[in-house]
Design a protein with these regions (language model features):
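Membrane-water interface at transmembrane helix exits
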Residues: 36, 72, 93-101, 141, ...
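Core segments of transmembrane alpha-helices
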Residues: 57-67, 129-138
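Interfacial segments of alpha-helical transmembrane regions
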Residues: 64-92
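N-terminal transmembrane-helix/juxtamembrane module of multi-pass inner/ER membrane proteins
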Residues: 1-63, 97-120
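Membrane-embedded catalytic cores of phosphoryl/pyrophosphoryl-handling enzymes
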Residues: 110-193
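Alpha-helical transmembrane segments of integral membrane proteins
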Residues: 7-11, 52, 77-85, 148-152, ...
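Structural signal for the C-terminal ends of transmembrane alpha-helices
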Residues: 22-24, 70-78, 143, 190-192
């Protein structure tokens, strides 16, 4: 029998996926695209875009792997379960990307400018960067970090997601799904502790 402290976070991730797929409903999809366009075209000060560019590091695969290795070194008893949860979250995101195949906003809408130096080659749904950042923010809570650090990590995860929409790499519902997959996966792992 699966314990509630594992099942409920898994349901959170599933809810993120299903609600994220609401972009397939025409009116919701139009609203998602409009919001992506508005965020992408908003006049922000240069420092804000530079900050979002730096913050994006928190969603990269290399940063994700480095933090997971450091966590496993700090708490060896976490290593196997943490690795399994992280691999499961990555696999879910990748499987959804190859199955759903949602085009990137910058490729689907000429009004959206790609604000990245490297053009992403995979599909848009879900945002794996948002998933990784959310996973790591949940890890700060599970690791017993002070409340301010947990809040800062959660704000960083939301910032990574906002930056992905701002950059033209994702729609808001891609980010929403990625955040909930990441939170769900790390909370499911934490439920096994």
């Amino acid at each position: 029998m699966i314990a509630a402290d594992v099942l409920l976070p898994a349901c959170l991730a599933l809810f993120g996926i299903v609600s994220g797929l609401l972009w397939k409903v025409p009116n919701v999809g139009r609203l998602d695209a409009l919001l992506a366009q508005r965020v992408n075209q908003a006049h922000l000060p240069g420092w804000a875009d530079r900050f979002l560019g730096v913050l994006r590091i928190a969603g990269t695969t290399l940063f994700f792997a480095a933090v997971l290795v450091l966590a496993a070194i700090a708490r060896p008893s976490w290593a196997l379960g943490l690795a399994a949860a992280a691999i499961a979250a990555e696999a879910i995101a990748k499987l959804l990307k190859v199955t759903i195949r949602r085009p990137r906003p910058s490729a689907a809408d000429s009004g959206i400018m790609l604000r990245l130096t490297r053009v992403p080659i995979d599909s848009s749904f879900p945002s794996a960067d948002a998933m990784r950042a959310a996973f790591l923010s949940g890890l700060t809570a599970a690791g017993g970090m002070p409340g301010w650090a947990v809040l800062a990590a959660m704000a960083a995860a939301v910032g990574v997601g906002f930056g992905r929409v701002r950059s033209g790499a994702h729609y808001p519902l891609d980010v929403w799904a990625g955040l909930l997959i990441g939170f769900g996966a790390v909370l499911a792992w934490a439920g096994t502790l």
